[in-house]
Amino acid sequence: MADFDMVLKCWGLVEADYATYGSLVLTRLFTEHPETLKLFPKFAGIAHGDLAGDAGVSAHGATVLNKLGDLLKARGGHAALLKPLSSSHATKHKIPIINFKLIAEVIGKVMEEKAGLDAAGQTALRNVMAVIIADMEADYKELGFTE
């Protein structure tokens, strides 16, 4: 619980502007891990230099962060929230678990730079994301999705 609380201390800034933070997160994900862009077919035709200003990228990033905010606020009691996300990402979108680890790293970097998440907060975020991703991986296995 302490890890969730530590991350939530900085979450208000993110929550106040999901679109901007979402754009920063996805643009950085696509820059640092270009292979992840292929997992988002709707962004395939967008030039790399135009990703940051694209409304669709921003909107999807906002959705990602909004869902993450819900998971954080559940403070570990996230099974009912996570199950449908796991299901859609395993069965419909076919997103390998490693990609959640990559975006978690990027979220941490963006929160450090833009929302004041300090070293202890970074550790807390890594701990929280490890729990969420492990639970998601268990859901994936239950659904028979292996990468």
Swiss-Prot record:
Binding site for O2: 60
Enzyme Commission number(s) of this protein: 1.7.-.-, 1.11.1.-
A GO-annotated cellular component: sarcoplasm
GO biological process: removal of superoxide radicals
Subcellular location: Cytoplasm, Sarcoplasm
Pfam families referenced in this protein's UniProt entry, alphabetically: Globin
Keyword field contains Oxidoreductase: yes
Keyword field: Cytoplasm, Heme, Iron, Metal-binding, Muscle protein, Oxidoreductase, Oxygen transport, Transport
Reaction catalysed by this enzyme: Fe(III)-heme b-[protein] + nitric oxide + H2O = Fe(II)-heme b-[protein] + nitrite + 2 H(+); H2O2 + AH2 = A + 2 H2O
UniProt-annotated binding residues for heme b: 89
Domain Globin: 2-141
Keyword Transport: yes
Binding positions for nitrite per the UniProt entry: 60
GO molecular function: heme binding; metal ion binding; nitrite reductase activity; oxygen binding; oxygen carrier activity; peroxidase activity
Main subcellular location: cytoplasm
Family stated for the protein in its record: Belongs to the globin family.
Subunit relationships: Monomeric.
Function: Monomeric heme protein which primary function is to store oxygen and facilitate its diffusion within muscle tissues. Reversibly binds oxygen through a pentacoordinated heme iron and enables its timely and efficient release as needed during periods of heightened demand. Depending on the oxidative conditions of tissues and cells, and in addition to its ability to bind oxygen, it also has a nitrite reductase activity whereby it regulates the production of bioactive nitric oxide.
Name of the molecule in the record: Myoglobin
Biological source species: Pseudochaenichthys georgianus
